[in-house]
């Protein structure tokens, strides 16, 4: 029974905080990485500000670095919608989940999708969990190919770097 409550652990909280940062950065037209860094610095000085988990920073940085590609992927799976028409919180949730599906090799795809749906239940409209699940259900089909291509590119870059030393 306690296992069902375990999923709301450190990684879940980190994902929620990343959604908060992406949402706030978009609303205030700020750089999300700078915002997360600022809050992290502030948390050291002010006990009233919650510490920023390393995984939160990883998520925010990953989304920011890959935003155009992530948005292209999400947009390609929207039917009768544009990315701009989605609620901002749904955009943030989808961006994090897509980044995890493509780049977080330590996160099983089912976990990335389940966590995104859970965040949509907590933070968005009644229709959002089903919508988020539907989009990610399509994205998860291409995730293995994207991960393989990214791994091959990374390996080639490492081999190239080691050959130049």
Curated annotation (Swiss-Prot):
Name the Gene3D superfamilies on file. Answer: NusB-like (1.10.940.10)
A cellular-component GO term for this protein: cytosol
Task: Tell me a GO biological process for this protein.
Answer: transcription antitermination
Report the SUPFAM superfamilies cross-referenced here: NusB-like (SSF48013)
Which UniProt keywords are present, listed alphabetically?
Answer: RNA-binding, Transcription, Transcription antitermination, Transcription regulation
List the GO molecular function terms.
RNA binding
List cystine links: none
Matching entries from InterPro entries are given as: NusB-like_sf, NusB_fam, NusB_RsmB_TIM44
Task: List the Pfam families.
Answer: NusB
Similarity annotation: Belongs to the NusB family.
Recorded hits in PANTHER family, A to Z, give:
ANTITERMINATION NUSB DOMAIN-CONTAINING PROTEIN, N UTILIZATION SUBSTANCE PROTEIN B-RELATED
Its annotated function is as follows: Involved in transcription antitermination. Required for transcription of ribosomal RNA (rRNA) genes. Binds specifically to the boxA antiterminator sequence of the ribosomal RNA (rrn) operons.
Protein name stated in the entry: Transcription antitermination protein NusB
Organism (species): Rhodococcus erythropolis (strain PR4 / NBRC 100887)
> Species lineage, top-down?
Bacteria, Bacillati, Actinomycetota, Actinomycetes, Mycobacteriales
